[in-house]
Amino acid sequence: MGMDVYGLNPQTTTERPKRPNNKDYQSEEWDRYFEKLNEYQNENVGTYFRNNVWWWRPLWDYVYQLNDDILTEEDHELGHSNSGHEITEAQCEVICKRLTEALDNGETEEYKKGYYLALENLPLVKCDTCEGVGERNDQYVQ
C-alpha cells in the first residue's frame, strides 16, 4: 500500500497523455501509455508524488513538524490516510519553501539521522509470524 499525492493546480509544460480505451491492460498500448505518463510526471514536477506507506508516514510527520503552524491536527491525521484530503495552494507553497530550506541547511539530514537512530533503538518484540528472525517464511510468501 502506498500514498498518492496529486497536485491540484500544478504548473505543466507538456500535455498529459490520454488513457487508452481498450481494457487489455497487458497490451503494448497500455505499456506505452504508462511510459509516457512517467515521462509526463517527471517533466511536470508537482503533478504526482507517490511513496509506500512505510516511508510516507515519517515524511508526513516531518512535514507536519516543520509546518504545525499552518497545518491543523486534522490535516496531519488525514494526511496519514488515502482519504483524498486536500490542503490549500498557500499551504503547499509554505511547505515547499520550508522543506527546501530544511534540505539546504542540513536540518532534514539531522532529522533523518535521528529517525534512523530511533528505529535502531526500538525494543525487540516477540513475533509469532517470523519467530524473531525478521523474515517471514510461511505459506503467504512462498
Question: Where are each of the predicted segments found?
Answer:
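Acidic (Asp/Glu-rich) sequence patches and key acidic residues
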Residues: 1-142
